[in-house]
Amino acid sequence: MRAGVFTALAVGLLCVSTTAESVPQRGSHVDRVLVLKKERTLELLSRGKVMKVYKVALGGDPVGPKTKQGDHKTPEGVYVLDFRNAHSQFYKSIHISYPSQRDRAVARRKGISPGGDVFVHGLPNGFGAVGAAHRLKDWTDGCIAVTNQEMDEIWQAVPDGTEIEIRP
């Protein structure tokens, strides 16, 4: 993304710790992902029980739901993590099924494009060393960003087809 942002954030790298919960065990069944935008968290759930919580960075203008392409907002609603990209420009990424039919209908009524290409992803390639410091500022175009190590954990724990709910 923006090289200057990541260079500045690298300074705070050693001052920011990761979440305390343990890594979800291989074979644990994550059946839902919950993102709380206000808290800047992503939770992995199994049968309603929180298995792991990650701190995240969101779109650069995160307050309110995504309504149009280029608004730098992270969508709000219930979607599906429907496919993954192991060769993403952001380390690894898992696609969020935004826009839904409802999102498209609202955008159509307004005569605008709802946008798309919203993912849960790691850090931009070449900036993995920034680590947890990336969370000091919301910086994505509307995606949900975690560290590369956290993305590896999510990648292993969350199967394609898992529901993701994104709340304000």
Describe these PLM feature segments.
Residues 22-31, 38, 58-83, 102-106, ...:
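N-terminal post-signal-peptidase region of extra-cytosolic proteins
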Residues 28-52:
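N-terminal targeting signals for Sec/Tat export/insertion, comprising classic cleavable signal peptides
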Residues 25-28, 83-168:
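Exported/periplasmic cell-wall-interacting domains
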